[in-house]
């Protein structure tokens, strides 16, 4: 009814492809760097195409210093009542699923993730709210560094992978 859809042009085009209703009268198209001032909050829109989907943008609220990061910085797993990353032992309980999430959801778009990380470096971020997984309010640089490592395809540990097939076990013994 009285709703305004705030989205970038690519998102509007996609909505029109999937839904049959007049959206033009209810839309505010935003682009890179645009600011939506609601009084207390000022939302800045930052394009992050292919950080999972082609139309992705993240939103930064300068009042709360919160980055609404869409699929970036997300993870698989159930929250179970603890919505903040500092309320769980993230490194031991969540990091494997965060790595798997990165690999499966945005892993092939390392260049685009790097572009987003460069944009984010110039923003005073106090909290990261991804679409999936816990909210980050402490130790943000640790998790941002993980994304840097993963998006540059830098090995986290030194290792060697030995791939073999062994019908009778001799090759397995040699490996």
Task: Give the ranges of each region predicted by the language model.
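Catalytic core of the metallo-beta-lactamase
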Residues: 20-87
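Cofactor-binding loop segments of dinucleotide-utilizing enzymes, especially the Rossmann-like FAD-
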Residues: 8-10, 71, 163-167
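Redox- and metal-dependent alpha/beta enzyme cores, enriched for Fe-S-associated oxidoreductases
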Residues: 166-175
């Amino acid at each position: 009814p009285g709703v305004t859809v705030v989205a970038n042009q690519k998102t509007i085009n996609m909505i029109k492809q999937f839904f049959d209703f007049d959206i033009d009268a209810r839309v505010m198209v935003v682009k890179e760097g645009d600011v939506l001032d609601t009084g207390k909050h000022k939302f800045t829109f930052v394009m992050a195409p292919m950080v999972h989907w082609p139309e992705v943008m993240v939103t930064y609220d300068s009042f709360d210093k919160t980055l609404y990061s869409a699929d970036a910085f997300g993870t698989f797993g159930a929250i179970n009542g603890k919505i903040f990353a500092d309320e769980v032992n993230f490194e031991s309980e969540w990091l494997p699923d965060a790595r798997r999430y990165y690999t499966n959801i945005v892993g092939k778009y390392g260049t685009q993730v790097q572009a987003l990380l460069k944009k984010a470096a110039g923003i005073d971020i106090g909290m990261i709210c991804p679409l999936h997984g816990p909210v980050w309010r402490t130790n943000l640089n640790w998790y941002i560094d993980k994304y840097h490592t993963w998006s540059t395809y830098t090995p986290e540990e030194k290792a060697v992978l030995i791939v073999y097939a062994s019908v009778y076990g001799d090759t397995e013994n040699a490996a």
